[in-house]
Amino acid sequence: MLRYLALSEAGIAKLPRPQSRCYHSEKGVWGYKPIAQREFQVAEDVRASRNSQANVYRFVEAFRQHGHKLAAVNPISIRTSQQELQELSPAFYGLQTQEPVRTDGLLSGPQVAHNVAQLEQLLKDIYCGRSTSAEFSYVEDIEEREWLARNFETLDQQQLGKSERCEIAELLIKSQAWDNFMALKFPTVKRYGGEGAESMLAFFWQLLRDSVQANIEHVVLAMPHRGRTPLQAALLNMRPAKVFRKLSGASEFSEDIEAMSDVISHFHVSEQLKILGKKLSFSMVRNPSHLEAANPVAMGKTRSKQQARGEGAFGDGSQPFGEHVLNVILHGDAAFAGQGINQECLNMAYVPHFEVGGSLHLIVNNQVGFTTPGDRGRSTAYTSDLAKSIQAPVFHVNGDDPEALARVTSLAFRYQREFRKDIFIDLNCFRRWGHNELDDPTFTNPLVYKIVHQRESVPDLYAQQLAKEQVLSESKAKEMRDEYMKYLGEELALAPAYQPPPSYFEKQWTNFQLAPSKELTYWDTGLDYSLLHYIGQQSVTFPEDFNIHPHLLKTHVNARLKKLENGVKIDWSTAEALAIGSLMYQGHNVRISGEDVGRGTFSHRHAMLVDQQTNEMFIPLNSMEGGNGGKLELAHSILSEEAVLGFEYGMAIDNPNNLIIWEAQFGDFANGAQIIIDTFIVSGETKWMESNALVMLLPHGYDGAASEHSSCRIERFLQLCDSKETSADGDSVNVHIVNPTTPAQYYHVLRRQLARNFRKPLVVVAPKTLLRLPAATSTHEDFQPGTLFHNVLGDTIAKPEQVRKVILCSGKHYYTLAEEREKRQAYDTAILRLESLCPFPIQELQAQLAQYGNVQSFVWSQEEHRNMGAWTFVRPRFENLIGQQLHYCGRCEAPTPATGIGKVHKREVDEIVAAPFEL
């Protein structure tokens, strides 16, 4: 039973010490439910065997911990002799070579050792002597360690059949043939082929087979450029004609689409594959050249698909995350060690509201980054060592052994299914050419490339092995190659006439379209106030046994109820709750992500309440009755911008019917995610025809908080938009940027995101001081049916015939200007607010200015410095399209957004507020 106000402010009992020191959700909230701890005990006979042979057990554990250091997993090693490790010597543990041992309980597998010497050889064969090695001794969970040891030590029992080996060989041959064909027909193209790393095809071959057998329905992949195109062509059903058409100078999209497009190494795949007679959806997310940046995008897209299927905490709890949707990430060796976004992604792996049920990682380890060798590209022994930060197991594999990779892939897949955790495969391979095929790597890596150029290719070595074992004849291998080369030749001939099929606005995007390019559209986003009143009440409703904070009861709950009842002084947080709650009522799910979003940086939102006795979380809107069942997910993020924003972008591109909001703690910190903003959010549609309605809330405003807590860098977002300077914008601009000044405006712009039949990213220059400013409130009439977001707010004070000066501004600066006008009684001055900056609202602005026939001057006033803010954006559009000179009033040029000296700040405020009236 829920209630509004069952507790009096004075009647809240003193609370006992909580069991948990931090807020939590033991009961679960939308998007997160605690996972019950698994019970595991090492069998009694196993413990007895280990205790009775303590030193022998230590010896076995030493190989599990250190054996990887001696494993022959590097196909181009220039090390001439194998080093010795004292930790792997029997004498180190006081053991004699002929001392009898029992392997029961110590080692898995059919092989038996009767003495220490035999055991040593057996351990060397398992952990040092084959094409694979393992690292998992640092995994804290004993069940996982036991599982990994048992399954790795029996890995060789899983042998491939003849037909399976031939399938792998054919894939490797196709990959090599692709690169050979490209080199022959397009010798000057930087194709970033897979030569030297062709074994990765065996990874995907095994992964797809295991996936369908485990009832996986959808695989989402993030992958960099290396080997991307041959994989797409050989295994993922991409027509080679698409690539060849692109290389002839045409677009990868149909001719009616005005897209700027991208290079072939950024092509994506979204296909339904047929594997072992079963259907499997496969999505390779689009990637920029910023390495690893696509990884959180894939994670977010994966979680969105899991949400749509009701997995994990989005359902009844009967199936964990990852039950039917699997996330897979490929890395480059230098990029995985070097790019900080990887640490951020791993840090998110098991965080509530970001978990995806464990990701499967493959590091394609070329052992060089452009020209930089590993010891110059990281401070650790392995490129995979970052994985240890989350205790993810790592398997190292020699790239010359595709069958070993297939076996390890199956093992890694089974681990992910069993424990729903991340796991890594480090594929040690090489890059046959330089960073691209036109680059000469011998300038900087002569010894390595002496080995590379003298050795045969991986596909040829494997084909020779199969021929020797009478599995695949040389003639059959040649036939495979010739047939594929013939097919590629046919595709090349078809390329000029090839028309790419639409790969956008499909499935869940079917009912959407591109935004109109020649007009601004207007959408009624108002609702009946009785419904909004109910939603507002529900936003502060909590259970009878819930122990609310007394201050929140007074200032948040009671205050909101009073505002709703009176229909006046509706503040920012209430308007936000009405927007979100009404979207939920209409059946949309809403997600707010970022640091401290439940409470809000400025303690204004309180969409999440915390029981003061139990620390249990409660989200009132998720208990709202009636409507179509939308839910609110409050995703308190790690202290990261780049990976978190990438994750939210991944969710936004997958489902256009959900509202995805990312809030920066302060707008100043958005630049920590600049790569995601630049290469995905504002450019994804024009490069890839990938729309999104992601909302970025960026708190902004000069209030004396110095340079890092004052500015979201409006000017940078305006520079990124493709608004025109000399003609009117349509809704088709790449990003919509608003600076709303009233709660109702904020309400309408949020609801508009999902009301339209197209999707655009939205940057909201969000308030700080306006959150509690009495003047910055709205009334219930502002939310009623027929109301909408206004791109320009006109002046309601000055009489048009008396106006001699018009001040244009945007954002909270309006309120200081209005206060100054009141002080001066300067009613010959009108103040217009540009609520929308992009698209630039020239029609609405012209309509407002048409009222003022006696204007003598136009002023742009802003609180930002002259080289910042919207001045350089507004001025050319105003002067070109209005035909009048626009004067500037604001702070002078500066290299940093705001002063840290209180006296200087106050003086600047006085000056910039007075200047427009004295000009």
UniProtKB/Swiss-Prot annotation:
<keyword id="KW-0809">Transit peptide</keyword>
<dbReference type="InterPro" id="IPR042179">
    <property type="entry name" value="KGD_C_sf"/>
</dbReference>
<feature type="region of interest" description="Disordered">
    <location>
        <begin position="298"/>
        <end position="317"/>
    </location>
</feature>
<comment type="similarity">
    <text>Belongs to the alpha-ketoglutarate dehydrogenase family.</text>
</comment>
<keyword id="KW-0560">Oxidoreductase</keyword>
<dbReference type="InterPro" id="IPR005475">
    <property type="entry name" value="Transketolase-like_Pyr-bd"/>
</dbReference>
<protein>
    <recommendedName>
        <fullName>Probable 2-oxoadipate dehydrogenase complex component E1 homolog</fullName>
        <ecNumber>1.2.4.-</ecNumber>
    </recommendedName>
</protein>
<dbReference type="Pfam" id="PF00676">
    <property type="entry name" value="E1_dh"/>
</dbReference>
<comment type="function">
    <text>2-oxoadipate dehydrogenase (E1a) component of the 2-oxoadipate dehydrogenase complex (OADHC). Participates in the first step, rate limiting for the overall conversion of 2-oxoadipate (alpha-ketoadipate) to glutaryl-CoA and CO(2) catalyzed by the whole OADHC. Catalyzes the irreversible decarboxylation of 2-oxoadipate via the thiamine diphosphate (ThDP) cofactor and subsequent transfer of the decarboxylated acyl intermediate on an oxidized dihydrolipoyl group that is covalently amidated to the E2 enzyme (dihydrolipoyllysine-residue succinyltransferase or DLST).</text>
</comment>
<dbReference type="GO" id="GO:0160167">
    <property type="term" value="C:oxoadipate dehydrogenase complex"/>
</dbReference>
<dbReference type="InterPro" id="IPR029061">
    <property type="entry name" value="THDP-binding"/>
</dbReference>
<dbReference type="GO" id="GO:0160166">
    <property type="term" value="F:2-oxoadipate dehydrogenase activity"/>
</dbReference>
<dbReference type="GO" id="GO:0030976">
    <property type="term" value="F:thiamine pyrophosphate binding"/>
</dbReference>
<dbReference type="InterPro" id="IPR011603">
    <property type="entry name" value="2oxoglutarate_DH_E1"/>
</dbReference>
<dbReference type="Pfam" id="PF02779">
    <property type="entry name" value="Transket_pyr"/>
</dbReference>
<keyword id="KW-0786">Thiamine pyrophosphate</keyword>
<dbReference type="GO" id="GO:0006096">
    <property type="term" value="P:glycolytic process"/>
</dbReference>
<dbReference type="Pfam" id="PF16870">
    <property type="entry name" value="OxoGdeHyase_C"/>
</dbReference>
<keyword id="KW-0324">Glycolysis</keyword>
<keyword id="KW-0496">Mitochondrion</keyword>
<dbReference type="GO" id="GO:0004591">
    <property type="term" value="F:oxoglutarate dehydrogenase (succinyl-transferring) activity"/>
</dbReference>
<dbReference type="GO" id="GO:0031966">
    <property type="term" value="C:mitochondrial membrane"/>
</dbReference>
<dbReference type="InterPro" id="IPR001017">
    <property type="entry name" value="DH_E1"/>
</dbReference>
<dbReference type="InterPro" id="IPR031717">
    <property type="entry name" value="ODO-1/KGD_C"/>
</dbReference>
<dbReference type="GO" id="GO:0006091">
    <property type="term" value="P:generation of precursor metabolites and energy"/>
</dbReference>
